[in-house]
Amino acid sequence: MLERLENCEKRFIEIEEEISKPEVINDARLVRTLAQERADLQDKVEMYRRYKTMAKELEEAKNLLESEKDEDMRGMVRGEIENLEKSLTDLYEQMTFELLPKDPNDDKSIIMEIRAGTGGDEAGLFASDLYKMYIRYALLKNWKTEVIDINGNVAGIIKEVVFEVNGKGAFSRLKYERGVHRVQRVPQTEASGRIHTSTATVAVLPQVEEVDIDINMDEVRVDIFHSSGAGGQNVQKVATAIRLTHMPTGLVVCCQDERSQLKNKNKAFAVLRARLMELEQSKVDEERTESRRAQVGQADRSEKIRTYNFPQDRLTDHRIGLTAHNLPHILEGYLDEIIDTLATHEQTELLKGED
């Protein structure tokens, strides 16, 4: 492992030299690529340098212990050696986790899509609950959210919602939410008290910069139409909603949340880029990144990742067998305990693979 870290340090030094060369400075894309690689290496290199410093201090302390005759001083040196050995062991473990393969999208903001699945109106209410939960979670993280498109009604039933979550590390946390979520509860309109089961699907796509993916504009059909949402006379007079159809893949993106046609168009293209990148990545590496269609699935009860059981006040994450209670608290956006457990499980599995 130390040899790998030494190579990281060498590459880090090379990048610092390269990034200052005139021919590199004039290439914006190359500068961006090198800066990202440098940022990815920085924590590893800082840990490795700290490890080397402590290892040298430990060696010096051991040499001092061999030559020191005064017992009081020897006792102090032994204490220092003990502390250094513990610190080195802890740091070695941290470096081991730091060397695990990282998802290159972890630092990115995201586009999240929630769709009601089986279960009629109850599925729409559950999709609304999930949407509110993620908005509250983003608020707790000081991330900003912005709706791109929403298909719902005044009763709080959401058939589909697409929105941005903007903040560093949003993908690293919320990527664990993609999949089919199931709810079991008694609807308010159910007189007999019978428990209903409904589903909603969640897709999480890292946001993609324009320079990361090229879209042939000749392959995109742009339709402009009147918004179906609230908006007063402006909606009646001016068509501002945008529908993009990417003809080679059949992907369709709608955006009608903004009053400005240009803003809706920009948002729609942001979603299209994210979806196209997801499809591209899925072809390159099926193991690392599921395609968007695989994420969304068919919202069927059989392919659930998590169940919210209201009568028993219990959440079960079926991927790792995690059980948590206090659903009202969780739905208020307090997801960190669940996400931390999923992230730790993923790191542990990756570590096994490294062995």
Curated annotation (Swiss-Prot):
Gene Ontology molecular functions: translation release factor activity, codon specific
Keywords, ordered alphabetically: Cytoplasm, Methylation, Protein biosynthesis
GO cellular component: cytoplasm
Residues bearing PTM N5-methylglutamine: 233
Cellular localization per UniProt: Cytoplasm
Post-translational modification: Methylated by PrmC. Methylation increases the termination efficiency of RF1.
Organism domain of life: Bacteria
Role this protein plays: Peptide chain release factor 1 directs the termination of translation in response to the peptide chain termination codons UAG and UAA.
Assigned protein family: Belongs to the prokaryotic/mitochondrial release factor family.
Protein's UniProt name: Peptide chain release factor 1
Taxonomy of the source species: Bacteria, Bacillati, Chloroflexota, Dehalococcoidia, Dehalococcoidales
